[in-house]
Swiss-Prot record:
The lineage of its organism: Bacteria, Bacillati, Bacillota, Bacilli, Bacillales. NCBIfam families: CysI, PRK13504.1. Transmembrane segments: none annotated. It is an enzyme of class 1 (oxidoreductase). Component of the sulfite reductase complex that catalyzes the 6-electron reduction of sulfite to sulfide. This is one of several activities required for the biosynthesis of L-cysteine from sulfate. GO terms for molecular function: 4 iron, 4 sulfur cluster binding; heme binding; metal ion binding; NADP binding; sulfite reductase (ferredoxin) activity; sulfite reductase (NADPH) activity. This is Sulfite reductase [NADPH] hemoprotein beta-component. The keyword 4Fe-4S applies. It catalyses: hydrogen sulfide + 3 NADP(+) + 3 H2O = sulfite + 3 NADPH + 4 H(+). It comes from Paenibacillus sp. (strain JDR-2). Siroheme binds at residue 488. Gene3D superfamilies: Sulfite Reductase Hemoprotein, domain 1. [4Fe-4S] cluster binds at residues 439, 445, 484, 488. Coiled coil: none annotated.
Length: 574
């Protein structure tokens, strides 16, 4: 294939963040000195930005912000630590370690994220190094859990369900390792590794990223049809596993250019769906990923960060240009994409027996928050299970948890423990609640404009009787809520979704595809709870009485004319 046209990288002066990365000496900056400063519980802005690459965000508890300001105190600074777990897999020993850190340094809970990672909230600055050291001692890491690099690689979390799942999990590990930053700064700062005075003296420190890394974060996910639980079309780079005639992994369809984030009021920003561009064999997976990443490295927008994601690079230059550039770098052509079929994006709850004879239990975890409450001792139950479990824990892309690779003997014991602590598999919750996703939002996320995790359950409380009255209590409807438009809970792929606009107010969207292949469309702007209920009630009632057999909610609201179908993000605001 010949090149259609030559494209130059985006012009304009590099942003302040680009200068920061360049001058950071491969992510060192002055982090060591700032961490040692006992005068403040926070970090200077420049080091705070660098800290993301090391897997942490500085936050403050916004519930206390006004009161502390009145008392002339600095904000209640604390840090969120995100732990990289490729494919969401953790051993029982690693689970117990994270559980203990939640009490030792955190706020007494664990957050399971929509990208299959752990988050630990409330860590104080003076405890950061100790926490990271304990995490690494358990063969986990926070490096590249955040920052302008390839993040935690997602995949279907049930590798013991079949040989195919096991192979796919292997590639999530390989991709995470291959694309991880190679700078020794992480080991120097956190693990007391041997210090290198000047990273440049080592030669090529970052052979893939270079000294300024990527223009923005880069997300990779691997889906295993018929489940699109990882929302593969939301990824910068997606792999769709294809089964061969021999029942083994033949390779992957590849899709590029997805992403959920946008900025309120700026129609030049939008969520986007990744496009399928071809098929690769397993031995081509790493080469393809590296070349795709380097295209974004070289052509992504480094002047304006809100336009810097890979989706804008592709949309700006065009898919034909991207394919030419990719082939030039690869030196070989992708094969034509193969047939596949997705049926759902949600989790399948309860016990499932794998082909190897072992069991997997998918547990519902509301908003991914593992915590003990007065009426739900989930954290205690999982702690006791981890003490006897000989398989794995697998975090799902829907913020739930799979207790995987369970023997028949251990299954009996785990069932007894769940009963002892009163934990249900998920069948006692409504289909709507089981299909809900939300980000953390307030009080710790500095970007949140409204509540999400703390509020969505109560909104569902009001929606459940409406659905029950319509006979839809068992109908899966993907509902998602975020406190801002950055898209952490992938709201643009919710059949019903809410994006925070201001305290108590949300933009309401509808019409995304049930299998994650169509974006939602804004239906109402800046509305509160009562208007949400008043708006959805007649739509739900009409859906119950007028839907076609097997018709999902997102498809119905388009057919009924409530919103238009959005299959490309460039039409999201039309």
């Amino acid at each position: 294939m010949a090149k259609n046209h030559k494209v130059e990288p985006v012009g304009g002066p590099p942003s302040d963040v680009e200068h920061l990365k360049l001058e950071s000496n491969y992510l060192r900056g002055s982090l060591t000195d700032s961490l040692a400063n006992r005068i403040t519980g926070g970090l200077p802005d420049l080091d705070n930005r660098l800290l993301k690459f090391h897997g942490s965000y500085m936050q403050d508890d916004r519930d206390y912000r006004n009161e502390r300001e009145k008392q002339k105190l600095e904000p209640y600074y604390q840090f969120m630590l995100r732990v990289v777990t490729p494919g969401g897999v953790a051993t029982p020993e690693q689970w117990l370690l994270m559980d203990s850190l939640a009490d030792k340094y955190g706020t007494g809970s664990l957050k399971l994220t929509t990208r299959q990672a752990f988050q630990l909230h409330g860590v104080l600055k003076w405890n950061l190094k100790k926490t990271i050291q304990e995490i690494n001692a358990a063969m986990l890491s926070t490096l590249a859990a955040c920052g302008d690099v390839s993040r935690n690689v997602m995949c279907n979390p049930n590798p013991y369900q079949s040989e195919l799942h096991s192979e796919v999990f292997h590639w999530s590990q390989q991709l995470t390792s291959h694309l991880a930053p190679k700078t020794p700064a992480y080991h120097e700062i956190w693990l007391d590794g041997e210090k290198v005075v000047d990273g440049a003296e080592q030669g090529e420190v970052e052979p893939i990223y270079g000294p300024v890394y990527l223009p923005r974060k880069f997300k990779i996910g691997i889906a295993v049809p018929p489940s699109n639980d990882v929302d593969v079309y939301s990824q910068d780079l997606g792999y769709i596993a294809i089964l061969g005639e021999d029942g083994k992994l033949a390779g992957f369809n590849v899709c590029v250019g997805g992403g959920m984030g946008m900025t309120h009021g700026d129609t030049a920003t939008y969520p986007q769906l990744a496009k399928v561009i071809g098929f690769v064999t397993p031995d081509q997976v790493l080469d393809l990923a590296e070349k795709v990443v380097t295209i974004q490295r070289d052509y992504g927008n480094r002047s304006v960060r809100k336009y810097a994601r890979f989706k804008y690079t592709i949309d700006r230059h065009g898919l034909p240009w991207f394919m030419d550039e990719l082939q030039d770098r690869l030196g070989w052509e992708l094969a034509p994409a193969r047939e596949f079929h997705f049926e759902h994006t949600g989790d399948r709850y309860g016990w499932i027996k794998g082909k190897d004879g072992k069991w997997n239990l998918n547990l519902y975890v509301q908003a991914g928050r593992v915590v003990d409450t007065e009426d739900n001792k989930l954290r205690s139950a999982l702690r006791e299970i981890a003490k006897i479990h000989t398989g794995d824990f697998r975090l799902t892309a829907n913020q739930n948890l799979v207790i995987a690779n369970v023997t028949a003997q251990k299954k009996t014991k785990i069932v007894a423990l769940l009963k002892e602590f009163g934990i249900a598999e998920g069948s006692n919750y409504s289909a709507l609640r089981r299909s809900a996703l939300s980000c953390v939002a307030l009080p710790t996320c500095g970007l949140a404009m409204a509540e999400a995790e703390r509020y969505l359950p109560s909104l569902i409380d009001r929606l459940e009787p409406i659905l029950a009255n319509a006979g839809l209590q068992d109908q899966e409807i993907n509902i998602r809520m975020t406190g801002c438009p950055n898209g952490c809970a992938r709201p643009a792929l919710g059949e019903i979704s809410f994006i925070g606009k201001s305290p108590g107010k949300y933009n309401m969207y509808m019409g995304a595809g049930f299998t994650g292949d169509r974006l939602s469309k804004m239906y109402k702007e800046n509305i509160g709870e009562d208007e949400i209920i008043d708006t959805l009630t007649p739509i739900i009632d009409r859906y119950a009485s007028e839907r076609n057999k097997g018709e999902n909610f997102g498809d119905f609201v388009i057919r009924a004319g409530y919103v238009k179908a959005v299959t490309d993000g460039t039409n999201f605001h039309d």
